[in-house]
Amino acid sequence: MSADANPDLKSADIGLIQQILPHRYPFLLVDKVVDIDGYQSARGIKNVTMNEPHFQGHFPGTPIMPGVTIVEAMAQTSGVMLGVGMDLIGTDMLIYFMNIDKCKFRRKVVPGDVLEMHVETVRGKPGGKIFKFSGRATVDGELAAEAEFTAMIDRDGKDG
């Protein structure tokens, strides 16, 4: 598998995302990934709607997207970026959180918002197992959340 096997592929729609990530409703938290630059950077898009199950309890009458789901959306964006950038489309790849650092929440994310997840690879190489990412989530250009996170890539879904 080559790190530049898809050099012209700069975006992933929901169909391609589902070929890369094992997540499905209600835990698939990215609708589209654009501006993919190999395995180095990408921008995910999540259209936040009232139909999401977490809004039933977080919080009744005042729906706010849970911060942990924002961080997960950044991680899923990173997974799609790696899947495209390292030619792991249609494989059994799994990515596991190992660490989350410097996580801060700056504004509420509510139904009707378009959440953009901007992710960059800080450390990690094609063929490697451990990757560190920097992520920022924005709504209308305003910072909603930020975090650094480390993940392990399991290319065949057997390393756990």
UniProtKB/Swiss-Prot annotation:
Q: Which reaction does it catalyse?
A: a (3R)-hydroxyacyl-[ACP] = a (2E)-enoyl-[ACP] + H2O
Could you state one GO biological process linked to this protein? lipid A biosynthetic process
For whether the record's keyword set contains Lyase, the answer is yes
Enumerate the GO terms in the molecular function aspect: (3R)-hydroxyacyl-[acyl-carrier-protein] dehydratase activity
Q: Where is the active site?
A: 58
Supply one GO CC term from the record. Answer: cytoplasm
> Which InterPro entries does the annotation name?
FabA_FabZ, FabZ, HotDog_dom_sf
Q: Look up keyword 4Fe-4S and say if it applies.
A: no
Q: What class of enzyme is it?
A: lyase
Q: Which CDD domains match?
A: FabZ (cd01288)
Q: What is its EC number?
A: 4.2.1.59
Question: What keywords are assigned to this protein?
Answer: Cytoplasm, Lipid A biosynthesis, Lipid biosynthesis, Lipid metabolism, Lyase
- Chief subcellular location: cytoplasm
Cellular localization per UniProt: Cytoplasm
Report the family membership: Belongs to the thioester dehydratase family. FabZ subfamily.
Task of the protein: Involved in unsaturated fatty acids biosynthesis. Catalyzes the dehydration of short chain beta-hydroxyacyl-ACPs and long chain saturated and unsaturated beta-hydroxyacyl-ACPs.
Name of the molecule in the record: 3-hydroxyacyl-[acyl-carrier-protein] dehydratase FabZ
Q: Which organism is it from?
A: Ruegeria sp. (strain TM1040) (Silicibacter sp.)
- Higher taxonomy: Bacteria, Pseudomonadati, Pseudomonadota, Alphaproteobacteria, Rhodobacterales
Gene (UniProt): fabZ
